[in-house]
Each structure stands twice: as C-alpha cells, then as structure tokens.
Amino acid sequence: MFLAALIATFGLAFAGPLTHRLTGRWANWLLAAAPAAWFAWLITLVPQVSDGEAWTASVEWVPSLDVHASFYIDGLSLLMALIVTGVGALIMVYSGAYLGTTERHIGRFYAFMLAFIAAMFGLVTADNLVTLFVFWELTSILSFLLIGLKHDYADARKSAQQALVITGGGGLALLGGLVILGVESGQWELSAIRDSGFSGEAVSFAAALILVALGAFTKSAQVPFHGWLPNAMVAPTPVSAYLHSAAMVKAGIYLLARVYPTFHEHELWSWLLVPAGLVTMLLGAWFAIRQDDLKRILAYTTLSALGTLTLLLGLGTEYAVKAAVVFLAAHALYKGALFMAAGAIDHATGTRDITRLRGLWPGMPITSIAISLAAVSMAGIPITLGYLAKETFLAAGLELDSGGPLLLVSAVASGVLALAAASLMTIRPLFSRPAPEHDLHPHGVSVGLWLGPIVLGAASWGLAFLTGPISTWFATPAASAAAGSPIDAKLYLIPEDPAVLALSALTILAGVAV
C-alpha cells in the first residue's frame, strides 16, 4: 500500500502540466495536497515511533536476486520525512504564486518539483540499500532538471550540469560503498546492518566508509565539492528554497546519520568528517557576509550549516548527535522561510541586491515579519529553535575531552558570522529609510508568497516553547535512531550548564559588534 501510494505521487507529479492546464491558478494548491497528505499520515506515526517502535513495509522487487523495496520509519526517518513533506507542501503553494500562471515552464516545474518531493520522501524512508540508491539518483536527476528549468539561459544550463556531474560522481562512489557494505555484512537492509552490529577493520570496510562519505560530501556540498551549491542559485527561488534548505542538500547529512551506528567507531570516520565539516562551516560563514545578493548569502550560510552538521556527526559523541538532530530541524525551518521571503522580496521589488534594498517594512509587513522571525532564529537568539540548536552545539564542544577548545572557538566564530549575515538581510533592507536613488516601490504580495515564510518563521519560534513535547516526540527518537542506541535528548530554553549560556551570550555580543 505504501509503495502504491508513493508511485501514485509520482504519477500525480507527471500529471502536473495537465493539472496546470485544467485548473490554472489553483494547480499549486491541488498538487500541494499530495505532500500535505503524506505529512498528515506521518503525524499519526509519531506516538508509535516515539515509543521506540519503527514502522516498516516491504514488497518483493527482484525475486531472483532477493531484492526487496523495503521501507523503515524510525525517529530519524520520521523527522526527515516530516521536513520533506511539510516544507514540500508549502513550497508547492509558494511556487504557483512565485512563477505565476503565465510562466511557460510552470507545468514542467510542477512535474519535476512534486516528483522530487516524492523521491526525497522515498530516500529518507528507504531501508533497502538498492532502494535507497535508486531514490538517491532520482534526486540528482530531478535537481538537474529543476536547476536547469530555464534552459534558455547559459548560466542555468552550466549550473545544472555542474550539479549533476558532482552529485552524479558522488553517486557512483556511494554505489560502490553500498555494494561493499551489503556484500561484506551479508545484509541489504540498513536496519538489519545496524542491528547486527556489523563492523570491521578490513580494508573493504574502510573502503565502504570512504566511498559512502564521498557520496554524502558531494550531495551535501562539503569542501571541496561545494561549488555547485552557490552556482545553483540561478534556479527559480522555489527550487532554492526546497532543494537547498530542506531537501537535497540534507540527503547527504541524512545518509551520514543513517550509517553512523555502523561506521562511527572507525578512526577514519572522524578523520574524514571533522576536517571537512569544520572547513565547510567556517568558509561558508565567511563567504556569506561577503555577498550582496540575498540568495547567495543564504547559499553560503547553508554551506556553513551543512558543515556544522557534518562536523557534529564526525565528533562521534551522543551530545553531538543530539545537537545535529536539533540543528537539522532548526535549519530546515529558518532557511526555508528565508529563501521564500527572499523570493517574495525579489518578486515585489525586482532585485535581491541588499545594497539597493531599503525600507521594505511599510510596503511588505508580513514578509518582513517572516524574514525577521527566521533571521533571528538563524542568528541563534533566544528564544528560538535556532538558539536551542546553538546551545546543544556549544554543549557538545564543552563535553569533548580533546579538541574542545578548537571546536568552541570555531563554533563561536561561525555563530558570530551567522548573526552578521542575518543582520545583513534584515536591518537595512527592512527597517532603514528608503533611498531616493533606489526607488523600488515595494508592494504587498499574495498569500501564496507569504504563507510559507510566515508558517516556517513562526515555527522557528513557537516550537522553542514546546521543549518537552519536541524532546519526547522528535529529538529523542531521532537522536536515538541516528546513534543506534537510546539517547535522552532533552532540550532546555535555559541551559543547565552556565558555560553554555556564557558562550552563547559571547557569540551574540560579538555578532552585534561585527
């Protein structure tokens, strides 16, 4: 039944052009119903999964090879699937308002975007290694089509090809790693590999680790494979808002979290992930504050966030896993809101250049509220989900026996730069006096353009007040699933350790000074 419903979602996706022709401006709302329905179904699984009982489904796929299309939803899969479907539904609504009914590519866009949502949903719920790889490659192909949607432009074609070459090459590495993992362990389901406690010191085990990490690094744009992500900003903003905040770039992080129980005790795990994550985190944050285009600022802060997630998983501690889970959710919410708000600003003013944008608040109050809510969360200001993520990150650094000081300095530095980037996007563009030489005449936008940003921006704040339910229903199950063992991932608005509060205050004060 699950597989049939997933296939039906792909079928609906390819009916996107017809749906647009038949229903016009209502097509985006109708197509958004598919991911919204998946989201609603996933919510019904929360009690079961939070009690530690995974949801499973399996269909015989290739009987002669004993290959099954198997699916497995535990705490980690559930969290990612909720992000994929929830943000996906909002993006579908946003897309119609952003592109308009006269955009000649909109029918194909609906098809590609809904198919991408379905592929991501399949990827984060897949248990079988072959099934996971099929969905992984589908996301690469569909991202190529989405980034190159306006193929009349050379930049769009070039950026789409660059993304496909880098992520496609990583996909080949991943295939090799998954095959080695399946053959050496004798298991082809990720849950079975984890439960078997399979590990090894053989060369083949190390090779599998390296190849899987390479696949993840290319998908999640770790240095030196990061170039495709900023260049992909030539894509329409709905593509950037989904692929580059909540979906595609998180696929590599999800994969690393999924194989964490198998690989994290091997010395190569930390040697690969920690340097890559640290360099990506700092370089992304530094380049972000040197941009003057809203989307490129967001692209580089996304790089920094992906580096942070890779770094946390590479540390190999329970607290770091907890921090990674919280940061993953927080980033998806505030970054999705910021990308969509940036698109709304571009739609209303005709520019994303922060040197020209001034005094948007009076003409775009709802969009301004949305971008402010999300930017404050990105800056890690209390009382937001972004603040909880920063708090757990700092606590993970304090917990380390060795390397802690370096990590803490790096965490504070990236936090300072993130706050500076958030300020660049909000203070002058929204609240300064309009400049006569930049007579932009910003105007209000339709509900489709502000609904997604305001929902995600408000969630970045509202969820921070629900630390008890969030800890019980989402953070603890997701962190436990990623670690492969029970983790009590309680969240606190006021940190238990005064040192965490002091470091957080230092980060904010330094960011304000910058």
Regions found by a protein language model. Give the residues of each.
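Hydrophobic alpha-helical transmembrane segments
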Residues: 70-85, 202-217, 408-415, 490-511
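Membrane-interfacial helical/loop segments at transmembrane boundaries in membrane proteins
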Residues: 53-65, 189-196, 392-396, 469-495
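Hydrophobic transmembrane alpha-helices and their helix-loop junctions in integral membrane proteins
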Residues: 90-107, 113-132, 141-445, 465
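Hydrophobic alpha-helical transmembrane segments of polytopic
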Residues: 2-9, 27-38, 77-84, 109-116, ...
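Short phosphate-coordinating micro-motif centered on Lys-Gly-acidic
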Residues: 137
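Cytoplasmic/organellar membrane-interface segments at the starts of transmembrane helices
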Residues: 361-367, 418-514
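Transmembrane helix-loop-helix hairpins at membrane boundaries of multipass inner-membrane proteins
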Residues: 1-4, 14-111, 183-202, 206, ...
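Hydrophobic alpha-helical membrane-insertion segments
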Residues: 32-47, 170-178, 371-379, 452-471
